[in-house]
Amino acid sequence: DIKDRLDYDVFDRKPTYVTLTFGMNDTGYDIFWKENAKELSEQRIEKSLESFREIEKRLLAENKMTKVLIGGSSYDETTKLNSLLFLHKNDAILKIIDAQRKAAKKNGWGFVDFNQPMVQISLEEQKKDSTFTFCRVDRIHPDNDGQMVMAYLFLKAQGLAGVEVSDISIDANNRNLLSHRNCKVSKLKKEAGGLSFDYLANSLPYPLDSIPRHGWGNKRSQRDAMDLIPFMKEFNQERLQVTNLEKGHYRLTIDGLFIDNVSSGQLEDGINLADYPNTPQYQQAMKIMYLNEERFEVEKRFREYLWTEYSFLKKEGLLFADNEKAINKLREYLPKDGFLRMSYEWYTKAMYPEIREVWSRYMKTIVDTIYKMNKPTTHKVKLTKIG
């Protein structure tokens, strides 16, 4: 129903960027168990692309926004996690992605492929563990590690790899700031058995969520993805290098808080402060992460509400009726639709405009708070020799 929702979901909001992805649901599921699966699959693909051609025309008519097509994440056909399998489903998805890629090239739009990079990672990992998959529940929905890989691919496609959080290099012997990028360093002092300085970065480290969270039976965390992609190296470098220190070990503190004991050799090579969840700047980023997760939880209620409107009530002539007749119609669908059963409770609340208004104000408060507290602050960094 993408084309039916373009105005309400996209164009009415006057966006400057639009990303579009589709293919997983379009290609069907149990059709791959039927004898004429190939024929049914081709029909589903053609129906999807026919709808896309209409969407493409609408997007071409809008010349004040940048368009990006995304080749969606893969259906994992190769994991041995279980025997429930829609064989050749990802092949069907790839045919849709090929059409997306060609359309993007023809129209001068951006294009990002999530599918094949995720397939390649999965195949490599399955050589070591045949049950490895990004989609542990159903071969469809990526867990948090898979979502993190998708984020990495999206950032990399924008040419952002190599942009550091900050980079500092200090010659301790001469009390000399050799270089600094994306930050300010001041009040550099050589002290007995160490040194100290004030540090103000232009950005915050990315806080990797180490706890599995959010829907679809997730079991893995963002941090689990760090063994699969060079995210820390390419996107999350908060590097501190100190050369010509007296040989030994040093206590690293920031704003008086103990961070770690590190050797002069480690400091000579450079350490990545973004690896330390206990730094004040990392903790600041964590607060922002949790606030944004709270915003997401509220925004998800609107998603469930609108999905119910367009998937069930629109075809009944009850789009945004939000009345007893709409409720009664949904109750007819409830016994036979598990997805509706998951969304129904949110619809019964969101159907009231006063409730939606309160939720909207709450989200705005969260976003305003994020932008008030997302500015890096100056920190006192100190290295003290301990042995």
Model-based region annotation:
Residues 3-387:
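Alpha-helical cap/lid subdomain in secreted, periplasmic
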